[in-house]
């Protein structure tokens, strides 16, 4: 037997074909969300407060200090928040200290700081009752970047940019004449020496002393002449910079100094963040810059006078390591004191080394380092600016290297915690201005922290972020895999990121640093391709937000691949050589072969085993979770694998899902970490178990109660239904499954079913990827899913009186009310069809002026039916089903409702949707198709043992698409079915061809794994042998019931008077210009005329046509289309005298838009209202207003 048995949880064993021994388990798959939020609660929030506070008033007599904060218990539980449309949030209380510096009086007070949304254990937030996810953002890391560009004459120029986390950019660039310029915050450029002079190093000799002699520096000094002898060079430079930054304002050296300090050297205005300081120190560090250069001076220990390195020595890694302590100490450190007019007058410490130029050995080049400021220094220092300039000047001498901005060492992740901290900081900064004013205006004696703090800006910033930020998204809840994928998504879009239109090809492309960090497969098709990515299965964030991936360390001394795990970021990995996970190893852990396949920077090639530093942990570390669920991924073309990974996320949860016969072993972990299952929190013994709750007694005697969710509506309108797995007496351990979630079976992800599939054509019904299906799959509910739709009706106070929910609906027979209770609300369990009343509701109607006789009759008979109109909630088109639940919210019960709403009724309708023609099906290899025909079981082709085939796919869908994995899955699936086993074939480490054929033979199948099939209609065998097997097929969320749409009379757009578009608006079909050309080409003038008039926007014509049709009269001639009238009016509005004449040269009167005519036409933008209107009123309401 090929393969070995592996247990997945307590309920499933699979035969695995993996050969690689994995030394590291997968991390928790949603830790990117949960860890980040926990960091925010523990340290991030405190840092934000400490950044903004203390706040002093303008006279500096009062100061508000931050002491601490604490979160109290959330107001609602998770379930209550869902039911009440509330947010799951906890109140935060902050303690402040108000110090009066004149009297020394201190007031300490705890201030309520609003409700802060709390992340659930599943990594989601509940905002206004809906489950949301904050997607992590992929942004350019703060730091210093160098680039090169070739001009039109083929000359190479260099540029550099310092990008802070917040603050102004500082850029350097060279021009065609070899002069170096700087730009401050994207303004006009000035010679870079001007900035150096402003920093207090004004003499030409001083500048040459700092940077060393070079053509670039000399050219720039020549360009930068002393224009105004009455000013010192520093003052003149400062004025010149001020003129660039604030053109047109009176320039003085003092104002320029304060401006520059604010722009770059004030930590409140300019923030590199910890990551920016780390990147700058790393890039400008002299150790990396000296590597492999030839030193041009003796390096002497300043204390002992000992020569450490002699001139002419090549600075190899070993040489640098030998003097590392000296470099980190005081070796070649020089102190420069700026002149008294400088922006910053503190002494500047630089570290300088002289090396030979790689381009000209006779030339000496100076390398200036920033002497590595402390990590706590978040603003720029003059040393940073001078060291950046030095690196920039060195580039043209061939020292240093330019940066690749798509390298994952230069892109980092802003996860939830950081995004929230940034929003909170924005809110606090707004609050700060407010506080400062109040502190200055009010009387110091009576002030308390409570009085001067207004929390509205803070709560508004947080609310706005959760409610409307591009990164706060409604959770994709089609199935557990889509939830998990959504939580691990990395988006380059969003505030501070890229935009779709500006993102070029390079940003979207796969980069070698994605290996083990970002999945090269899972990304959307279409405009977002490559901008939205997914974290690879082992990916993990370090404290700076760079993605790390794990490797096994190789002991270079013994050549043994150890089990020690090292996590590397992309730029750390660049220094090493990494071998693939499938490198063959001996028993003692050394490489079995002298030459191994490996990677170093961007090169995939063979390396000598002795030069390898690390080995991949697992073959699946390259890909994301969804991709790792595709068996035989290595045999699929990547374009189709992308579709396969994306389509698994669109699978609809079925009534009775089955885990795949051929899996990858990833199904268990994905289901476990998705948050959709009920997982045991502690060890214990099950003492009670039913469909809705499970009780587990812990060893210490305490009781854990687990609630099992039944048929809750998910965000996608599917049934979120959990099924209990354990029974009384079972022993459970922490982390075991207590209940399966939707799309799970026995603790494994189960998105679809295992039908018997044949690759064959049948009467042309599987042309163009169509799928032919057996009626068995319909009758036995194999692909049946439950969908829940929510409808709501609210009663408000109107000018004419309150709306009422009642059974007394005017002009409706008893038949329509049979399922309503005495309040007029539908009973649970009722079967409803389109147009049935769900909630009877009446709205007061304005009294018309009645005649005296009518008023008399009213007074006598009290006929109230005239005074109200029926605004009941009815079942919309396509909404029929069974009422699953009704929820009623009223003020009397203490429910929070919007202002003006007295009562809210929600009705949930469940639909059982069987698979039907027009539904979309797919395999896991990107092989998708639409069901084209459902054939009776007796007519389906059958196997020699009489088993009818379930699905027929077109064999032409395989060769050109190059997704051969589906055929291998088909054969292995058949063998698994015959043997009664489940199989795991992990990606890049799965069943080989031999394993496949061995298993096929073991299952007693023919040696080519094909079969003779018999035609179910005639009983004759088909001419050729057919590939038949078991393939995992899923039903996708694109169902024909949601897409089928037909319009009768419906709403029209306000301006053009043309029908709206789209199913949601009950719109019409667009007849565009190309369709018009087609009719013109056929000369179908009458058809064309009625399409352009009656059926579109001839307002009077369509009313008359409607009337004529209902009365059986001939249809009158059409009039002028509304859009033509709009065109005429628009031309007139431009001042053109535009008139329309008939054939007798008489002017045609174009009707004017009357006031009050838009009662029941609608504006294209009011789509939401359109939906409500469609739900509440029958389709006939939007006849046009002319008939009144």
Curated annotation (Swiss-Prot):
<dbReference type="InterPro" id="IPR007645">
    <property type="entry name" value="RNA_pol_Rpb2_3"/>
</dbReference>
<comment type="similarity">
    <text>Belongs to the RNA polymerase beta chain family.</text>
</comment>
<dbReference type="InterPro" id="IPR007644">
    <property type="entry name" value="RNA_pol_bsu_protrusion"/>
</dbReference>
<feature type="compositionally biased region" description="Basic and acidic residues">
    <location>
        <begin position="1161"/>
        <end position="1175"/>
    </location>
</feature>
<dbReference type="Pfam" id="PF10385">
    <property type="entry name" value="RNA_pol_Rpb2_45"/>
</dbReference>
<dbReference type="InterPro" id="IPR019462">
    <property type="entry name" value="DNA-dir_RNA_pol_bsu_external_1"/>
</dbReference>
<protein>
    <recommendedName>
        <fullName>DNA-directed RNA polymerase subunit beta</fullName>
        <ecNumber>2.7.7.6</ecNumber>
    </recommendedName>
</protein>
<dbReference type="Pfam" id="PF04561">
    <property type="entry name" value="RNA_pol_Rpb2_2"/>
</dbReference>
<feature type="region of interest" description="Disordered">
    <location>
        <begin position="1149"/>
        <end position="1188"/>
    </location>
</feature>
<dbReference type="GO" id="GO:0032549">
    <property type="term" value="F:ribonucleoside binding"/>
</dbReference>
<dbReference type="GO" id="GO:0006351">
    <property type="term" value="P:DNA-templated transcription"/>
</dbReference>
<dbReference type="InterPro" id="IPR007120">
    <property type="entry name" value="DNA-dir_RNAP_su2_dom"/>
</dbReference>
<keyword id="KW-0804">Transcription</keyword>
<keyword id="KW-0548">Nucleotidyltransferase</keyword>
<dbReference type="InterPro" id="IPR042107">
    <property type="entry name" value="DNA-dir_RNA_pol_bsu_ext_1_sf"/>
</dbReference>
<dbReference type="InterPro" id="IPR015712">
    <property type="entry name" value="DNA-dir_RNA_pol_su2"/>
</dbReference>
<dbReference type="Pfam" id="PF04560">
    <property type="entry name" value="RNA_pol_Rpb2_7"/>
</dbReference>
<comment type="subunit">
    <text>The RNAP catalytic core consists of 2 alpha, 1 beta, 1 beta' and 1 omega subunit. When a sigma factor is associated with the core the holoenzyme is formed, which can initiate transcription.</text>
</comment>
<dbReference type="InterPro" id="IPR037034">
    <property type="entry name" value="RNA_pol_Rpb2_2_sf"/>
</dbReference>
<keyword id="KW-0240">DNA-directed RNA polymerase</keyword>
<dbReference type="InterPro" id="IPR010243">
    <property type="entry name" value="RNA_pol_bsu_bac"/>
</dbReference>
<dbReference type="Pfam" id="PF00562">
    <property type="entry name" value="RNA_pol_Rpb2_6"/>
</dbReference>
<comment type="function">
    <text>DNA-dependent RNA polymerase catalyzes the transcription of DNA into RNA using the four ribonucleoside triphosphates as substrates.</text>
</comment>
<dbReference type="InterPro" id="IPR014724">
    <property type="entry name" value="RNA_pol_RPB2_OB-fold"/>
</dbReference>
<dbReference type="InterPro" id="IPR037033">
    <property type="entry name" value="DNA-dir_RNAP_su2_hyb_sf"/>
</dbReference>
<dbReference type="Pfam" id="PF04565">
    <property type="entry name" value="RNA_pol_Rpb2_3"/>
</dbReference>
<dbReference type="InterPro" id="IPR007641">
    <property type="entry name" value="RNA_pol_Rpb2_7"/>
</dbReference>
<dbReference type="Pfam" id="PF04563">
    <property type="entry name" value="RNA_pol_Rpb2_1"/>
</dbReference>
<dbReference type="InterPro" id="IPR007642">
    <property type="entry name" value="RNA_pol_Rpb2_2"/>
</dbReference>
<dbReference type="GO" id="GO:0003677">
    <property type="term" value="F:DNA binding"/>
</dbReference>
<dbReference type="GO" id="GO:0003899">
    <property type="term" value="F:DNA-directed RNA polymerase activity"/>
</dbReference>
<keyword id="KW-0808">Transferase</keyword>
<dbReference type="GO" id="GO:0000428">
    <property type="term" value="C:DNA-directed RNA polymerase complex"/>
</dbReference>
<dbReference type="InterPro" id="IPR007121">
    <property type="entry name" value="RNA_pol_bsu_CS"/>
</dbReference>
């Amino acid at each position: 037997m090929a393969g070995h048995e592996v247990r997945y949880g307590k309920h499933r064993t699979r035969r695995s074909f993996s050969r690689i021994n994995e030394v590291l388990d997968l991390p928790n798959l949603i830790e990117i969300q949960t860890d980040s939020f926990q960091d925010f609660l523990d340290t991030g929030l405190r840092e934000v407060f400490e950044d903004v506070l203390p706040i002093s008033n303008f006279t500096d007599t009062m100061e508000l200090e931050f002491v601490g904060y604490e979160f109290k218990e959330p107001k609602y539980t998770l379930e209550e928040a869902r039911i009440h449309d509330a947010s799951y949030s906890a109140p935060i209380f902050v303690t402040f200290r108000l110090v009066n510096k004149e009297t020394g009086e201190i007031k300490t007070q705890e201030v309520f700081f609003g409700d802060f949304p709390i992340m659930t254990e599943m990594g989601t937030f509940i905002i206004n009752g809906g489950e949301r996810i904050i997607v992590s953002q992929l942004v350019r890391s703060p730091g210093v970047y160098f680039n090169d560009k070739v001009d039109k004459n083929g000359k190479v120029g260099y540029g550099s940019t310092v990008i802070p986390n917040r603050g102004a950019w500082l850029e350097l660039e060279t021009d065609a004449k070899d002069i170096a310029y700087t730009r401050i915050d994207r303004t006009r450029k000035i010679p870079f020496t001007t900035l150096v002079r402003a920093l207090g190093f004004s003499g030409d000799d001083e500048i040459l002393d700092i940077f060393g002699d070079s053509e670039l520096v000399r050219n720039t000094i020549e360009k930068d002449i002393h224009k105004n002898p009455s000013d010192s060079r520093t003052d003149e430079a400062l004025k010149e910079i001020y003129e660039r930054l604030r053109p047109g304002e009176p320039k003085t050296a003092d104002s320029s100094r304060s401006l520059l300090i604010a722009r770059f050297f004030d930590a409140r205005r300019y923030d590199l963040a910890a990551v920016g300081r780390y990147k700058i120190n790393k890039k400008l560090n002299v150790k990396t810059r000296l590597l492999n250069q030839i030193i041009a001076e003796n390096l002497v220990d300043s204390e002992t006078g000992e020569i450490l390195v002699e001139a002419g020595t090549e600075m190899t890694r070993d040489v640098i390591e030998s003097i590392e302590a000296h470099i980190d100490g005081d070796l070649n450190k020089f102190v420069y004191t700026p002149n008294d007019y400088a922006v910053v007058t503190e002494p500047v410490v630089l570290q300088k080394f002289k090396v030979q130029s790689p381009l000209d050995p006779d030339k000496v080049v100076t390398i200036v380092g920033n002497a590595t400021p402390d990590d706590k220094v978040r603003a720029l220092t003059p040393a940073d600016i001078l060291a950046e300039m030095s690196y920039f000047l060195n580039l043209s001498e061939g020292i240093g290297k330019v940066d690749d901005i798509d390298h994952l060492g230069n892109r980092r992740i802003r996860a939830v915690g950081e995004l929230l901290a940034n929003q909170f900081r924005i809110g606090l900064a707004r609050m700060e201005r407010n506080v400062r004013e109040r502190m200055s205006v009010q009387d110091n004696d009576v002030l308390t922290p409570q009085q001067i703090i207004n929390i509205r800006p803070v709560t508004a910033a947080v609310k706005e972020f959760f409610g409307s930020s591009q990164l706060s998204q409604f959770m994709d809840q089609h199935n557990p895999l889509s939830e998990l994928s959504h939580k691990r998504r990395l988006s380059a879009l969003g505030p501070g990121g890229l935009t779709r239109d500006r993102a070029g090809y390079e940003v979207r492309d796969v980069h070698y640093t994605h290996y083990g960090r970002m999945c090269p497969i899972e990304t959307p098709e279409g405009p977002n391709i490559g901008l939205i990515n997914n974290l690879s299965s082992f990916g993990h964030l370090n404290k700076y937000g760079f993605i790390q991936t794990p490797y096994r360390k190789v002991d270079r001394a013994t050549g043994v691949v150890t089990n020690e795990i090292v996590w590397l970021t992309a730029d750390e990995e660049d220094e090493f050589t990494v071998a693939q996970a499938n490198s063959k190893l001996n028993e003692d852990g050394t490489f079995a072969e002298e030459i191994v396949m490996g990677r170093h920077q961007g090169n995939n090639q063979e390396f000598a085993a002795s030069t390898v530093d690390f080995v991949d942990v697992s073959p699946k570390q390259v890909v994301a979770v969804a991709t790792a669920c595709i068996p035989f991924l290595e045999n699929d073309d990547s374009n189709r694998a992308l579709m396969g990974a994306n389509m698994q996320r669109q699978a609809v949860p079925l009534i009775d899902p089955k885990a795949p016969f051929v899996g990858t072993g990833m199904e268990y972990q994905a289901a476990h970490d998705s948050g959709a299952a009920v997982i045991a929190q502690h060890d214990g013994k099950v003492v009670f178990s039913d469909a809705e709750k499970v009780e587990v007694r812990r060893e210490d005697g305490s009781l854990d109660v687990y609630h099992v969710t039944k048929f809750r509506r998910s965000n996608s309108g599917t049934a979120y239904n959990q099924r209990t797995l354990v029974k009384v007496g079972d022993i459970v351990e922490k982390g075991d499954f207590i209940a399966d979630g939707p799309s799970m079976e026995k603790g494994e992800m189960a998105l679809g079913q295992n039908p018997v599939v044949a690759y064959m054509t049948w009467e042309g019904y599987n042309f163009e990827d169509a799928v032919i299906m057996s009626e068995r799959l319909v009758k036995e509910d194999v692909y049946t899913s439950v969908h829940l739709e929510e409808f709501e009706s609210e009663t408000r106070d109107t000018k004419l009186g309150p709306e009422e929910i009642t059974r007394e609906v005017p002009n409706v027979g008893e038949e329509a009310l049979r399922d309503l209770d005495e309040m007029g609300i539908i009973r649970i369990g009722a079967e409803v069809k389109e147009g049935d009343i769900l909630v009877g509701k009446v709205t007061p109607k304005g009294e018309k002026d009645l005649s005296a006789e009518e008023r008399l009759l009213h007074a006598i008979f009290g006929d109230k039916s005239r005074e109200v109109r029926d605004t009941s909630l009815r079942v919309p088109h396509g909404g029929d089903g069974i009422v699953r639940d009704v929820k009623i919210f009223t003020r009397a019960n203490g429910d929070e409702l919007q202002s003006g709403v007295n009562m809210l009724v929600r009705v949930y309708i469940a639909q059982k949707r069987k698979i039907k023609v027009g539904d979309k099906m797919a395999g896991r290899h990107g092989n998708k198709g639409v069901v084209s025909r459902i054939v009776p079981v007796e007519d389906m082709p059958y196997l020699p043992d009489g088993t009818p085939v379930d699905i027929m796919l077109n064999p032409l869908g395989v060769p050109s698409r190059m997704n051969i994995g589906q055929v291998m899955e088909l054969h292995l699936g058949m063998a698994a079915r015959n043997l009664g086993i489940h199989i795991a074939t992990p990606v890049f480490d799965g069943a080989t061809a031999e394993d496949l054929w061995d298993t096929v033979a073991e299952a007693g199948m023919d040696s080519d794994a094909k079969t003779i099939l018999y035609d179910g209609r005639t009983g004759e065998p088909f001419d050729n042998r057919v590939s038949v097997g078991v393939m995992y097929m899923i039903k996708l969320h694109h169902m024909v019931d949601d897409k089928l749409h037909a319009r009768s009379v419906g709403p029209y757009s306000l301006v053009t008077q043309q029908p709206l578009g789209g199913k949601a608006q009950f719109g019409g079909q667009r007849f565009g210009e190309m369709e018009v050309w087609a009719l013109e080409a056929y000369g179908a003038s009458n058809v064309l005329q009625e399409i352009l008039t009656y059926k579109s926007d001839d307002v009077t014509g369509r009313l008359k046509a409607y009337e004529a049709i209902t009365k059986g009269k001939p249809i009158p001639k059409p009039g002028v289309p509304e859009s033509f009238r709009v065109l005429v009016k628009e031309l007139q509005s431009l001042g053109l005298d535009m008139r329309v004449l008939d054939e007798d040269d008489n002017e045609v009167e174009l009707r004017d838009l009357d006031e009050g005519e838009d009662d029941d036409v609608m504006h294209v933008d009011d789509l939401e209202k359109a939906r409500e209107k469609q739900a509440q009123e029958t389709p006939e309401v939007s006849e046009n207003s002319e008939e009144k």
